[in-house]
């Protein structure tokens, strides 16, 4: 499991490390399949992201008008299980894993709004503002460097794409943002709603 932004010239040290790990597997001669997912749907549950949704009704990430089709962990697990069941046809291949519908952050906020029945908005930050928030939250520098670098990649379209593989391989389309939020509704409950 790598990531969609893995490449030799990545400004993210972590994404470059993923690219290096892919090359090591390729050079090893071991039968390998590389999976490069875009941002997971679970990113919405990441403490910093989730807390701004729950507490403030906003997504405040520095992603500009970039787009991606969030991919749920359980959809990735189905892909992995299917490949492991019959690996021969997949050895040596690299697959990009995306959800079914590409959205910008305003579209993701609208999808969350649709499910939760309360207004969620996208309020983009600058990269320096984002870095400051992550530092205040106590994230390690390696992670902050990665998240800020991939935010620029996101703005530049590196995370874009829609599923052309999962439904065909597994026989089931990947979850939409709405499906994911509905299945994790309790995680997005406000304090007042959770206390009822």
Task: Spell out what each predicted region is.
Residues 128-196:
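A hydrophobic C-terminal alpha-helical subdomain
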Residues 1:
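N-terminal Rossmann-like NAD(P)+-binding domain of SDR-like oxidoreductases, especially those catalyzing
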